[in-house]
């Protein structure tokens, strides 16, 4: 199976397991800059040179050898499950993508027809989001009406493939304390170019795709919604130390235990 979703600097200074909706655009640009002294001109997801990616055939053997021998510092980044799925809804369901089209073509018409979701004009964001949550749960639990999408499938699922196939993380940090976490990675590796995290832009490539969130995070999650979120993301809350009880508290409640993550996700 290899290491899907894994990126590595050309210098092999660091390896990163991408988790969608968890600052991956910014992280990719930091990696690129640390090698080249300049940011990639465009969305780093579109880069086909200057950085190794599992999706690029020529990179696969290099990544596989590096990861299985643990030759480089390896990390990933996680995010509060409440804000992550909200972000997925506004970006992927309500938004227009980089190519000027709706995400995955017929997905939004399917949601409008089967789940009664609205995405146009001055729609009821809370009601539509809660219906989207039912859809997300259906895809994850029953794989219908489609397979789960990488942007709302559990973070633990993405992170576990790296472990199960022979990799080990040296660091997993929280998006909510991004500068501190990313700096801890940069401090641990040999890099060709220093990166000033405080001065660099944030490469939030999904920003502006969809409407702005009109309410506080907690307003989107009633008791049923919280139940659905916990059903989907139970392992994410527990392993990455987020507060399930209070959707309004986006900050983690504690430090991530790497040994626990490897033990539970390596099974």
What are the functions of these language-model segments?
Residues 1-267:
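Membrane-interface amphipathic segments in extracytoplasmic regions
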């Amino acid at each position: 199976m290899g290491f899907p979703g894994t990126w590595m600097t050309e210098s092999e200074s660091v390896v990163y397991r991408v988790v969608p909706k968890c600052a991956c655009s910014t992280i990719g640009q930091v990696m690129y800059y640390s090698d080249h002294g300049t940011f990639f001109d465009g969305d780093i997801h579109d880069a086909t040179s200057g950085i190794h990616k599992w999706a690029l055939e020529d990179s696969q053997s290099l990544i596989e050898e590096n990861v299985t021998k643990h030759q480089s510092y390896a990390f990933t980044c996680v995010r509060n499950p409440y804000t992550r799925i909200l972000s997925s809804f506004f970006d992927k369901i309500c938004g227009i993508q980089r190519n000027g089209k709706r995400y995955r073509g017929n997905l939004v018409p399917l949601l409008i027809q089967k789940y009664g979701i609205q995405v146009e004009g001055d729609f009821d964001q809370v009601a539509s989001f809660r219906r989207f949550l039912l859809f997300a749960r259906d895809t994850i639990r029953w794989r219908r009406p489609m397979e789960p999408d990488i942007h709302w499938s559990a973070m633990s699922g993405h992170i576990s493939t790296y472990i199960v196939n022979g990799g080990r993380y040296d660091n997993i940090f929280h998006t909510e304390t991004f500068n501190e976490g990313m700096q801890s990675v940069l401090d641990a590796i040999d890099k060709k170019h220093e990166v000033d995290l405080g001065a660099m832009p944030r490469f939030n490539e999904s920003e502006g795709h969809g409407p702005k969130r009109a309410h506080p995070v907690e307003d989107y999650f009633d008791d049923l919604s919280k139940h659905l979120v916990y059903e989907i993301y139970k392992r994410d809350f527990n392993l990455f130390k987020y507060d399930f009880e209070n959707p309004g508290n986006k900050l983690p409640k504690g430090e991530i235990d790497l040994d626990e993550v490897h033990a539970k996700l390596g099974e």
